[in-house]
Structure formats: structure tokens, C-alpha cells
């Protein structure tokens, strides 16, 4: 998806760089309901993730992460915008009349055909088990649990690499740099997720960020002591602590957030690069 620059007629267009418009389809059976967000609050209404709220109303698009239409060819009918993710989505019409949305693989165009199964060609957009893929294949939408659907490498521009197969496991290098083991029977989609230029997008004005449901970010040092451990003091004051802290008093900037003794610890061969 190309990045579009406007004429510099106003400050917002002068500083903005947005992706070219991919229109949404009219409402169908795969687009339903208002996508209700928690706005960063938990069930008690307490803020657990800051700087979230507002934003435009969204409709949820049901995405087929399982790709369980086995050995039935489908054709890409349209490439559409999805407000719930950075990646674009494709509407697929299968030969048996089924219609589904999938993540848009990079380079796929309207009219291309895709298929999922065990003995299918190694072609962009096709889904098949890791055991049937050659080493070095670029993949996305990777299953962790067999039959649950893809959970890894689903963001815009994400791509993982199959680097080894031994025994019942396959070794993958993920976009974060992490190297981990996954069952060879799990499925993945060949290719890279589209919309790789999303990191070049520049909103240009505060209103555009407000539409996305993101609120302004305020530094803790300018808050009151009741609101943040860094707050308080007369005028410009230091944080008053040896190390920075979160609003709840926990160490910030470098503290590991992964749970200890997690079930997948023995599957991770190398931690992600920071």
C-alpha cells in the first residue's frame, strides 16, 4: 500500500503522510456488531492501560485465522481496510460458495487464487503445515496450538522464517528476533503480511490520533504526587527517586514483564532482541 502525501496547504496536510485509501466493503455477514473496546479500563472501571479512550465507532470483521477450507481453491475478490488492525484484509470467494476474510499477503492482487491443505504449492497466500514447507520459507499467521488458528506474525509487515525441522518440532525465527520451537503439524501461511509501509505513516495532527482512540500522553513529572510517583515539587523538579517508576510504583524502563515459569519457557531457544 503506497504512502500518499498531500499538498502543503495547511499545517496538518504539510506534516501528514497517510496510506492510500483502501475502501471498506458494504456491510455483509462477515462484518457485524459494534466492536466494543474497554478504553483501557478493567471490569471494575479502573485504568489499567493509559492514554486510551474515544475514537471512531468500529465494526468487527471476522477474520479466518484457521484457514480450514481444505483443498478448496478461493479467489481474491477485494482488498479492504480493517479499522481493527494495521494490516489490510482480503475477501475470498471459495469454490463451494463460502466467503471469508483473510490477512492480505504482500504482493497479492485481486484475481489471485489461494488454497489451504497438506499438499499444496508453496505459493504466497497458501496455508499448509510446517512439515510440508522447505527450510527458509517466509511465513505469517502461525499457529501455536494445532487447530486453534494463527496467533503469531499477524501485524502489518510481519514475517517469520522457518530455519530448522527436527523430530516433532520446527524452529522458527519470529519478527521480534525470538527463536522458538513449534509443532511441525501446526499450519502457517506462506509470505509476508501486506501494508509494510505502515511505519512510514505520519498522522500530521492531533485529531487523526484522536480518531484512533488514543489520548494525549502526559509526563509523570508534571503530575501531582497523588497521580504519579514522579509528581510534585516546586517548579521543575527531579523525580525524587533513584530509578524511574510506573504510575503504580513498580520499576520502569527495563523491568521484565514476562511471567516466571511460563509453560512455553522450554520452547524458547533465544529470547527476543530488545
Curated annotation (Swiss-Prot):
GO MF annotations, alphabetized: rRNA binding; structural constituent of ribosome; transferase activity
One GO cellular component term, please give it: chloroplast
Q: Where is this region: Disordered?
A: 1-20, 223-274
Q: Which GO terms describe its biological process?
A: mitochondrial translation
Subcellular localization: Plastid, Chloroplast
Q: What is its main location?
A: plastid
Q: Which Gene3D superfamilies match?
A: 2.30.30.30, Nucleic acid-binding proteins (2.40.50.140), Ribosomal protein L2, domain 3 (4.10.950.10)
**SMART domains named in the record:** Ribosomal_L2, Ribosomal_L2_C
Q: Which InterPro entries match?
A: NA-bd_OB-fold, Rib_uL2_dom2, Ribosomal_uL2, Ribosomal_uL2_bac/org-type, Ribosomal_uL2_C, Ribosomal_uL2_CS, Ribosomal_uL2_dom3, Ribosomal_uL2_RNA-bd_dom
Keyword terms of this UniProt record: Chloroplast, Plastid, Ribonucleoprotein, Ribosomal protein
Q: Quaternary arrangement and interactors, per the entry?
A: Part of the 50S ribosomal subunit.
Task: Give the matching NCBIfam families.
Answer: rplB_bact (TIGR01171)
The similarity annotation says:
Belongs to the universal ribosomal protein uL2 family.
Protein name, as recorded? Large ribosomal subunit protein uL2cz/uL2cy
Amino acid at each position: 500500500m503506497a504512502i500518499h502525501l498531500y499538498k502543503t496547504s495547511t499545517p496538518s496536510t504539510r506534516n501528514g503522510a497517510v496510506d492510500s485509501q483502501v475502501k471498506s466493503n458494504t456491510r455483509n455477514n462477515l462484518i457485524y456488531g459494534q466492536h466494543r473496546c474497554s478504553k483501557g479500563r478493567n471490569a471494575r472501571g479502573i485504568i489499567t492501560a493509559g492514554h486510551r479512550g474515544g475514537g471512531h465507532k468500529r465494526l468487527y470483521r471476522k477474520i479466518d485465522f484457521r484457514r480450514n477450507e481444505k483443498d478448496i481453491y478461493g479467489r481474491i475478490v477485494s482488498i479492504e481496510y480493517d479499522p481493527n488492525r494495521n494490516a489490510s484484509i482480503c475477501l475470498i470467494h471459495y469454490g463451494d460458495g463460502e466467503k471469508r476474510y483473510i490477512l492480505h499477503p504482500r504482493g497479492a492482487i485481486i484475481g489471485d487464487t489461494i488454497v489451504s491443505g497438506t499438499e499444496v504449492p508453496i505459493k504466497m497466500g497458501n496455508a499448509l503445515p510446517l512439515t510440508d514447507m522447505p527450510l527458509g520459507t517466509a511465513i505469517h499467521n502461525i499457529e501455536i496450538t494445532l487447530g486453534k488458528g494463527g496467533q503469531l506474525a499477524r501485524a502489518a509487515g510481519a514475517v517469520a522464517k522457518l530455519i530448522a525441522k527436527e523430530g516433532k518440532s520446527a524452529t522458527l525465527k519470529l519478527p521480534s528476533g525470538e527463536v522458538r520451537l513449534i509443532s511441525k503439524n501446526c499450519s502457517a501461511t506462506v509470505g509476508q503480511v501486506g501494508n509494510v509501509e505502515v511505519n512510514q505513516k505520519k498522522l500530521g495532527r492531533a485529531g487523526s490520533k484522536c480518531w484512533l482512540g488514543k489520548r494525549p500522553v502526559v509526563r509523570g513529572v508534571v503530575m501531582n504526587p497523588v497521580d504519579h510517583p514522579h509528581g510534585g515539587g516546586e517548579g521543575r523538579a527531579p523525580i525524587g527517586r533513584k530509578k524511574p517508576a510506573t504510575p503504580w510504583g513498580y520499576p520502569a524502563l527495563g523491568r521484565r514483564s514476562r511471567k516466571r515459569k511460563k509453560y512455553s519457557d522450554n520452547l524458547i531457544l533465544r529470547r527476543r532482541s530488545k
